[in-house]
Amino acid sequence: MAGVLGMILAGGEGSRLRPLTESRTKPAVPFGGSYRLIDFALNNFVNADLMRIYVLTQFKSQSLFQHMKKGWNVNGITDRFIDPVPAQMRTGKRWYEGTADAIYQNISFIESTDPEHVCIFGSDHIYKMDIRQMLDFHKKKKAALTVSALRMPAKDASGFGVIEVDEHGKMIGFEEKPSNPKCIPGQPGIALVSMGNYIFEAESLCKELIHDAALEDSSHDFGKDIIPKMFPEGNVYVYDFSTNHITGEKKEVYWRDVGTIESYWEAHMDLLKKDAPFSLYNRKWPLHTYYPPLPPATFSDSDNGRVQIIDSLVCGGSYIRGSRIEKSVLGFRSNIASACDISESILLGNVKVGKGCVLRRVIVDKGADIAPGTEIGVNLQEDKKKYHVSDEGIVVIPKGERVGY
């Protein structure tokens, strides 16, 4: 789409997702067996024919670079690019100090591409969004800035920017991560929150970034600094995400923040529901990613019993023998020996599980090897002595770990 530049913020450290982010940036964390978190933001752009995209990285970005090189290479197509951009300290010897600073340090890309509008989106949420519809709203309102927003229970809104709007969709109030979020008038218990997705008129964006960069007391963040300064000037509008329609889908919009181990696990369980609120199978809104050349998954009975796969996703290259898999997601090359019982668990790929293992509500990172007869998630008090266990009782096995040997 001419006149539009996409910039995706993909530098998140993801400290609340540890140990999954010990060796990778948050947007590179695998999801849904076949994908990485970054894929959902990229698909929202590509499916909307927005094909000039810079992906701004910072922490532990090598696996993200490799994934994008293999799965998102559009080089050779005139005026189309999806380019990862490492932090380069272009404006001084410092890393990005906030979301606005990340864009400011790369303002030269905006100047050189000369877009009319700049779409700045995050990369660590699970959702589908036709950005064209938000862009149409932005243009209709002739806004300097449009912020996408959704409704959520006020009790859960303190981790987000909370918005107030008038009857025309104009922003009249904004508070970043308030301790006591304001509810929508007439909707007790419900708050309107920012999704962290912005469309700027390019000239206004550059003006605000340059002004903010000169302020010593600024945290150089869109939510903390840029939006609170801009909305009183009267040209900031709010796009209601619930009005966004995806071709080929009839369900209500789905959006999930996967910033914690619990929410990451819950989002996977959403995929496995009988009427899943988030579908991976809409041919009219395909979810592109890098898919390695692997043989189909293989299921075989064994002397210990028949293989049972119930309400689960199993990726290519996997081999499961005489075991029971229920409500679980198994990534590429999952190797499950016989007589195992795995439920409500997530295996991120290239995982080996020995004979007779029991896994309950476990996340196993790539390359882990679990010894025969190991039980994880059955006795949480014992698990806490050996593994990372979240407050909600989700056990996480780190990347490459050898367990039970």
From Swiss-Prot:
GO aspect biological process, one term: glycogen biosynthetic process
Keyword Transferase (UniProt): yes
Keyword terms: ATP-binding, Carbohydrate metabolism, Glycogen biosynthesis, Glycogen metabolism, Nucleotide-binding, Nucleotidyltransferase, Transferase
GO MF, one annotated term: glucose-1-phosphate adenylyltransferase activity
Keyword Transferase belongs to the record: yes
Binding site for alpha-D-glucose 1-phosphate: Y96, G161, E176, K177, S194
Catalytic activity: alpha-D-glucose 1-phosphate + ATP + H(+) = ADP-alpha-D-glucose + diphosphate
EC number assigned by the record: 2.7.7.27
Pathway: Glycan biosynthesis; glycogen biosynthesis
Domain of life: Bacteria
Family: Belongs to the bacterial/plant glucose-1-phosphate adenylyltransferase family.
Function as written in the Swiss-Prot or TrEMBL entry: Involved in the biosynthesis of ADP-glucose, a building block required for the elongation reactions to produce glycogen. Catalyzes the reaction between ATP and alpha-D-glucose 1-phosphate (G1P) to produce pyrophosphate and ADP-Glc.
Quaternary context: Homotetramer.
NCBIfam families documented for this protein: glgC, PRK00725.1, PRK00844.1
Protein name, UniProt field: Glucose-1-phosphate adenylyltransferase
Native species: Aliivibrio fischeri (strain MJ11) (Vibrio fischeri)
